[in-house]
């Protein structure tokens, strides 16, 4: 393992760890560009090198060993990445050979923008993007607008406007002030953290979403998109895979943002991602991947994987089931057909407990009968209901929880949208709940909550029409949900198409 300094286009030396195979070259290469510290990837580099790849991990500009200003998601990631790939091809151990851009989270953004750059020696030959944090706007907000407060506060406190990282910065601040994220306005958070974060306010002005997904439609490079059904960026992973113009493969496992670092309970749900990446990279560089889109999605809780084609929910292997509100076979209203969404007392994202119905309703609560048999879910979920709010702006948050026969609760699906319907007028509200990959055992009941907030995961809508990140005044919002014509829609496996994930992805 050696450390070299790769010159960026403006001459900035980018600190890069390099690990070469023991065998004579030339070697194909793997490039990882990360803001989280290149030294954390040394075991990964050795793994690639053991399989015949020259492996590089680089600190992005302004982070750890690389000097310069640190501006997340700016255009320099593309140009610095291209300069690094071109430098790799100039080395004797490369011989101008193929390069794979690899990355997880922000590093996936770096890999993708490098892969989507102009043709030439600076563009890699394939890309592996895991749990991709695609861009500033993509990470800051949900597709329908609500701000991802706690996740962005945690990331910016840990990594923003500094050359190093303090992963527990937000946790320490919350220990000192448990109500830290409640203080208004949201843009003044750095004052309460006690350090300068000049880029924090601009985060919320970033637009538009989906830039990398749109650019990806013109690419002809092979793509491996890896995500988790519990990852907040799962839908971005799917959108990237669906829209990619070249041979595209999807692996959607039973994981969160840390992927297999959080070990699944069932051994057969586990995948050796390192071995998969090597096998896929070899197939991609050799031109052995079929041109069509292909992927696999977990059936979490079963140890099985379901094969998918052009779109997760297309084809005869799945169908949509409808769970009507207030129907014997659907979802029965427990309470809260009328409720008050009060941002001073918001429904919390970090608490699955629900009120017993003896207090004034702060959400609409529905419950299904027990499942008579196991149910495999593999595809998108949606809540569609008729409702009204008496305020000019309103967020609608829907949380679906699986209750086992003993009553233990486990999150199943979530979605939130922002609406500006005329006050008091009933409207049809559609809330996408993400893509599910799950086996529900017999006896499971589905509990559905419809609320006006999901705090602290999401910033509170003030209900005044003001921007939630600059607002300083909060107002309650009276809500009414109509059961008629309202339902939960789930994609279920109609015809089992079990596959082994690694062979399916590498062909």
Q: Which residues make up each language-model segment?
A:
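Glycine/threonine-rich phosphate-binding loop and adjacent beta-strand/alpha-helix elements that clamp
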Residues: 5, 288-507
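Conserved alpha/beta-hydrolase
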Residues: 49-65
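Short glycine-enriched nucleophile-adjacent loop
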Residues: 108-120, 240
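Accessory cap/linker subdomain of secreted extracellular hydrolases
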Residues: 116-218
